[in-house]
Amino acid sequence: MISFKNQIKKLNSSGYLRKRSVVSNENSSKVILNNKLLTSFLSNDYLGMSKNRIIINELKKSANIYGIGSGSSPLISGYSKSHHYLEKEIAEYLNVEACLVVNSGYMANLCLMNIFDQQMNVIQDRESHNSIIESSKINKIKINRYKHLDNIHLEKYLDYKNRDIIFSESVFSMTGDITNIKEHYKLKNKYDSILFIDDAHGFGIAKCPLKNCSIENSCSSFNIKMSNIDAYMGTFGKAIGTVGAFVCGGKDLIDMLVQKGRPYIYSTALPRCIIDATRKSLKILVSNKSRYNKLHKNISYFNQRALKKNITMDLTNGPIKTYMIGNPHSTLSIKDKFLKAGILVQAIRYPTVPKGHDKIRITITSDHTKKDIDKLLNTLENIHCEKSK
């Protein structure tokens, strides 16, 4: 039998060993761990939709009629009326030609790069999500990676002679940094490039100034029409509270994904009950902005309080906040200090982030109260004071 004991031991001693915790989620802000109720700042269920009774009842109703599995891939018999309607509805919400629903955000990015040949040049941020990096590597497409959020460095890789692909997250999942999509769009036009935006952490929650925005997204937050983006990816497992993802863009793009998107072609389709629950969640979010408004009130409150306490961290208008440590062992130690205070946060370490960029990751949701946020920041303030000594 093959043994990995030495490798596991080495990871543990270096502070990079990953571990799972068995938790029970009460909602997006409260979890039970080791029989203790804790305040959680771990969840990407930003609007608390996974616990919405209307959505849960829709899932139950659909499961009672259609069962809990799709039974086959989308190109066999797994593509139902519900899948078709969801794709049409997303395309209408975002004002694009077509949409393809897939099983996960990772799969969406893998599918997207399947349709390009190895002659293409993909330009990515150095802190891109693993799915963006791996989607190009697997398909043996040339990758150039520019300094984080550095559009001047990005432009050095663009060439008038080639149709390069600029592929970026809108909101970086491990830092909370927000891409200036407007600048990317300008470079796309200047060099006749192709622009892909992965909006996993922006779809449904991005701060959107447009009154006619059906469903909030990062492109609208920069006043960029979705039709100006060659491919846009969003997920259902975050703001929408279900599971799955989608790619949208021109009809030709979606048709080609159906022809060549191998993870889509060869995977069992999402269950119809999940699709029906997702449709219901989207309809609620389009018609009722109360949870969206509560989330942004919580984000503003966090930012104001953190500034007042002089805690050093980037304070964007998104829900992801990070506190830089720079050492894996110290990061794990600080995570334990939060745990002793009854708070769950995530220790992010290499290889998820570059070495020396180890940090504490915090996510704000609409379920958090001011009391929750104050408790978190008071604990963080004490840690920050100790760290600064």
Language-model features and meaning:
Residues 2-6, 10-66, 162, 193:
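N-terminal "arm"/small-domain region of PLP-dependent enzymes with the aminotransferase-like
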Residues 45, 144, 148-197:
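Active-site phosphate-binding strand-loop segment of PLP-dependent enzymes
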Residues 53, 57-61, 65, 88, ...:
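PLP-dependent enzyme catalytic core of the Aspartate aminotransferase-like
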Residues 57-104, 299:
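Conserved N-terminal alpha-helix of the aminotransferase class I/II PLP-enzyme fold
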Residues 119, 124-168, 290:
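PLP-dependent aminotransferase-class I/II
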Residues 192, 213-236, 255, 259:
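Conserved active-site segment immediately N-terminal to the catalytic lysine
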Residues 231-233, 240-289:
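Conserved core segment of the aminotransferase class I/II
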Residues 293-300, 307-342, 352, 357, ...:
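Conserved PLP-binding catalytic core of the aspartate aminotransferase-like
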